[in-house]
Amino acid sequence: MKVGIVSDIHCNADGLRDALGVMGEIDELLCLGDAIFEYQFSNDVAAILKERQAHVIHGNHEEVFFSSAGSRARDRDWIDHDLMAYLGDQPHRRSMTFGTKRFLLVHSTPWDPRGEYVYPHSSHLTRFAEADADFVLYGHTHAQVVKRIGKVTVINPGSAGDARDARNDRQLSCAVVDTETDEVRVIDYADRRFPVG
C-alpha cells in the first residue's frame, strides 16, 4: 500500500495539486495539519482534501482559525460552510493502521503540551520513539525528517505549501510510504508561485 503524506499546505492549492502529481498513484492521503492559515481559509485546499478522502488532522493554524480568535475569519461570506465544517470536524491527532503498519499522525509532538518545534537536529526527536506505532508522522517545522529511532520511523514530509527548509533550497515537499517495503520517499518540487530562472 502506498500512503501519501502532506503537511503545512497553508492555503496553497497549487502546491497540494503538485504534491499529488509528484507522488504518483497512492492508496491513502494523509494531511498533518496547517492546511490553512490561522486567519485565512481555502475552499480549494479543503475541497481537494475532502474529494481525495484524505485523513486530516488539525495543526496550530486550524486551532486558531476554529477558536474564538478566528471568529472574524470564519465569517467571510465567500467561505463554503460545508467545507469549513468538514475541516473543523477533524481531530488534532489520529492513530491508524494501513496493512499491518500502525501510523500515529500529529502536527507537532505526541506529548503535551503540543506545539514544540522539533527540528531534525533536536535532541527531542528521540522522544517520538516512545509512541506505540511503526510510523510517527509530524509537520509543524516545515523541515524534512526521515529517521529510524528504535522500532519507530519518524517522518516529517516538509511543507507542501510554504517551503522554509534551506536544506532542499526551500522547495515544497511531500512523502510517500510503501507499507509493504517500509520505503519512505521524500519528494521535492518547485513552488510555482516562485519560478526559478
Protein language model annotation of sequence segments:
Residues 70-76, 99-132, 162-165:
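Active-site-proximal segments of metal-dependent phosphoesterases and phosphodiesterases across multiple
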Residues 2-92, 96-97:
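Core catalytic region of metal-dependent phosphoesterases/phosphodiesterases
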Residues 28, 55, 103, 134-135:
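Short, Asp-centered acidic motifs that coordinate Mg2+ and/or phosphate
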Residues 183-197:
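A short C-terminal boundary segment appended to hydrolase-like catalytic domains
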